[in-house]
Amino acid sequence: MEFYGLIGEKLSHSLSPKIHNTLFKDLKIEGAYKLFEVEKENLGKLIESIKLLKIKGVNVTIPYKQDVMEYLDFISDEAKKIGAVNTIYLEDNKLYGYNTDYYGFGTILNNNEIVIRDNVAMVLGNGGAAKAVITYLLDHGIKKIYLVSRKIKGNSADKDERIEFKTYEEISEIKGDILINTTPLGMYPKVDDTPVNEDIINNFNSLIDIIYNPRETRFLKIGKNSNKKVCGGIEMLVGQAIKAEEIWQECQLDNKLTQGLYSIFENEFK
C-alpha cells in the first residue's frame, strides 16, 4: 500500500481525495489518499513525518504553498518562478517540490486550442493563483499581459517587461485576445458576482475562469452570450492532479484515461 495526502488548513470540502482515488483505481495502484489538516506551527513536523512514514507524495494547498518550500531538498524551475509548491514527491529520502497548477492552467489552453504565443492577455487578480497563470503565459510566448488588481503590487513572477499593471478603473479601453479571471468573484455561493462587466468582456475573444464551482460562472455566461470561447476551471483542477500523479508514478498518463476523468468531474457542479 502506497500513501499519499493533502496538506492544508481546512480540507473538508476538498475534491483531491476523490480525484486521486479515482486515478489509483484506474491505474490499478494500491494507494490511500489522506487529508492532513495542520496548524502553521506544526508544519515542519508534518513535513518531517512524510520522510519517517514514507509517504510517497503529497499535495499542498492554501495557506502553505509558500511555507513548505523551506523544508524541501529540491524545487522545480516553475515552482521557483511562481514562488509556491503544491506537489511534493518523496524519493530516496529527499523531498522534491513542484507546482502543478502551472501545468493545470496549460491543460485549459491545450484542451481548448487557445493560442497564447504573440497574443495579448489580461489577468484579473494578483494573488497566488495568478502567479502560476502569469508564469505559464510568460514561458509560452505571450506578447503582453495586463495584470489587473485593486492595489498595484508586484511579485517575483511579475518582473518582466511584457507585464503592465492596471487598476480596474483603467481597463475599459483595453482590447486583447484572452481574459483570465483568477479572483474568487463568482465562486459559490456568490454566483451572481463577476469581476468585470460585459463591456470589458466584449473586448476579448476567449475567456478563462479558474473557478470550478459553479461550472459556468456569471463571467463565463456573459461571454458565452456574446459568442466568446469560454473555459471553466475544472480542467485546471483535474489537470494539476493528473500532473501530480505523473510525477509520483514517473509516467505519462494515457490520454483516454485523463479525458474520462474530466468528464467525471465536470458533472460534480451545476
Swiss-Prot record:
Domain of life: Bacteria
Protein name per Swiss-Prot or TrEMBL: Shikimate dehydrogenase (NADP(+))
Catalytic activity: shikimate + NADP(+) = 3-dehydroshikimate + NADPH + H(+)
Gene name, Swiss-Prot/TrEMBL: aroE
Function text: Involved in the biosynthesis of the chorismate, which leads to the biosynthesis of aromatic amino acids. Catalyzes the reversible NADPH linked reduction of 3-dehydroshikimate (DHSA) to yield shikimate (SA).
Membrane spanning stretches: none
Top-level enzyme category: oxidoreductase
Entries under HAMAP family matching the protein: Shikimate_DH_AroE
EC number of this enzyme: 1.1.1.25
